[in-house]
Curated annotation (Swiss-Prot):
Pfam families: Toxin_35. GO terms for cellular component: extracellular region. Expressed by the venom gland. This is U4-lycotoxin-Ls1b. It is found in: Secreted. The keyword Secreted applies. Transmembrane segments: none annotated. Enhances the high-affinity desensitization of human P2RX3 purinoceptors. The toxin is composed of 2 domains: a highly rigid N-terminal inhibitor cystine knot (knottin) domain and a rather flexible C-terminal linear cationic cytotoxin domain that forms amphiphilic alpha-helices. Residues 89-108 are annotated as: Linear cationic cytotoxin domain. Disulfide bonds join 48-63, 55-72, 62-88, 74-86.
């Protein structure tokens, strides 16, 4: 009976060791594959639309200002046909906040 317990403990120890080695090898191979894929990956950032330019093609493409991102506003100009015109603009609240921050920067130093 003692021999059976001894062999079962030995078997479990060897089994856990071998399974850990296999998992470690699998993880290292997966890490190597991921690193090689990341090395081949190219950055594909979209070009942003500058302030006061047309953003009707992509309404989420406006560039960032100093503190916040500009917003694409769409409107219908007066006296023209019913075509919608969109442009990237800075919200008034953000404009005021940037002015306050600029004043604070000049006061503080």
């Amino acid at each position: 009976m003692k021999v059976l317990v001894l062999f079962s403990v030995l078997f479990l120890t060897l089994f856990s060791y071998s399974s850990t080695e296999a998992i470690d090898e699998f993880d290292s191979d997966a890490e190597d594959d991921m690193l090689s894929l990341m090395a081949n990956e190219q950055v594909r950032a979209k070009a942003c639309t500058p302030r006061l330019h047309d953003c009707s093609h992509d309404r989420h493409s406006c560039c960032r200002g100093e503190l916040s991102k500009d917003v694409c506003y769409c409107f219908y100009p007066e006296g023209e046909d019913k075509t919608e015109v969109c442009s990237c603009q800075q919200p008034k609240s953000h404009k005021y906040i940037e002015k306050v921050v600029d004043k604070a920067k000049t006061v503080v130093g």
